[in-house]
């Protein structure tokens, strides 16, 4: 793929995008030779590009994005993040950022911030996972582990969940999670926000159970608090303590070095009462040359 091919790809994708958060170009899956370092998103009225590595084509790519921004006339701002630099700075290249920015998905709004941190507050590749939770949440008690900004929780409440418990050790992201519920007019009386280290808070988690639907969506690595390769099994080993008799589990992992066999083995060895149901498909807008290195959303069920 050359720069002209990339430009044409973006023009084609941009014609079909509306207000919903859309991945226009996904190079991270290595499906496009020479562009593994690049992603481009349309987030409501912002064109947002992330450069994960330094590359000689960077200046030309930013110039092409300026042209796309001007040509299409559908965005209010162009933001480019240099993820490879310390603190992952984002620069406003064109236009003016709205006072409040949102990711819109399946009629729900999530607050996002393009200039405050490495991550904007929303992971678009998890759309099918959120849809699954929304479709299966009716009347259920839901546990959302590593809840981040609580998008799963908002989806669950929108789907009729009886209650949701969100657990994340970062109070700031839980505050954004509260706001995400408020943005959508969702009743937070049904929602708990627990700012705790999950691996040290099992008694609190058990107290609010048992849960009918459990979401496990950890970072692959978080210095000092979680490493999927060694800590994921500590969660699986505890599931029987707070899972309802017919509990559904969405077990997610986005570590390229750990495949589906890793999660299946953890369940087989540590929670044999749960059987594997399926792996949810990933979005077509996130192509990959190796499915085992991409996002893995595995569904397990306790009981019949």
List the predicted regions and their residue ranges.
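Non-catalytic accessory regions of SAM-dependent methyltransferases
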Residues: 1-44
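Conserved class I S-adenosyl-L-methionine
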Residues: 139-148
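S-adenosyl-L-methionine
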Residues: 169-215
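Class I S-adenosyl-L-methionine
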Residues: 263-304
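Non-catalytic substrate-recognition/targeting regions of SAM-dependent transferases
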Residues: 33-34, 38-39, 58-123, 131
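S-adenosylmethionine
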Residues: 198-270
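Conserved SAM-binding loop of SAM-dependent methyltransferases across substrates and taxa
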Residues: 149-161
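Conserved SAM-binding motif I beta-strand of class I
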Residues: 163-168
């Amino acid at each position: 793929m050359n720069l002209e091919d990339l430009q044409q790809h973006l023009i084609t994708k941009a014609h079909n995008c509306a207000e919903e958060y859309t991945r226009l170009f996904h190079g991270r899956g290595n499906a496009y030779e020479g562009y593994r370092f690049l992603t481009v998103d349309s987030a409501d009225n912002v064109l947002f590009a992330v450069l994960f590595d330094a590359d000689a084509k960077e200046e030309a790519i930013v110039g092409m994005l300026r042209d796309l921004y001007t040509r299409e006339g559908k965005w209010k701002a162009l933001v480019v993040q240099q993820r490879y630099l310390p603190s992952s700075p984002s620069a406003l290249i064109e236009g003016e950022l709205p006072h409040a920015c949102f990711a819109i998905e399946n009629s729900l709004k999530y607050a996002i911030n393009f200039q405050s941190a490495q991550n904007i507050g929303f992971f678009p590749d998890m759309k099918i996972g959120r849809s699954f939770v929304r479709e299966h949440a009716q009347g259920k008690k839901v546990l959302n582990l590593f809840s981040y900004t609580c998008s799963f929780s908002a989806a669950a409440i929108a789907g009729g969940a009886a209650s949701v418990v969100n657990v994340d050790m970062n109070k700031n992201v839980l505050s954004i999670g509260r706001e995400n519920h408020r943005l959508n007019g969702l009743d937070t009386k049904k929602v708990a926000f627990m700012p705790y280290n999950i691996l040290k808070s099992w008694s609190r988690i058990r107290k609010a159970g048992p849960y009918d639907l459990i979401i496990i969506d950890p970072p692959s690595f978080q210095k000092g608090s979680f490493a999927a390769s060694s800590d994921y099994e500590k969660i699986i080993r505890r599931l029987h303590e707070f899972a309802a008799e017919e509990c559904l589990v969405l077990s997610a992992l986005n570590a390229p070095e750990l495949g589906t066999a890793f999660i299946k083995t953890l369940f087989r060895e540590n929670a044999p009462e749960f059987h594997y149901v399926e792996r949810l498909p990933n979005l077509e807008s996130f192509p990959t040359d190796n499915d085992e290195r991409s996002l893995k959303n595995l569904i397990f069920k306790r009981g019949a």
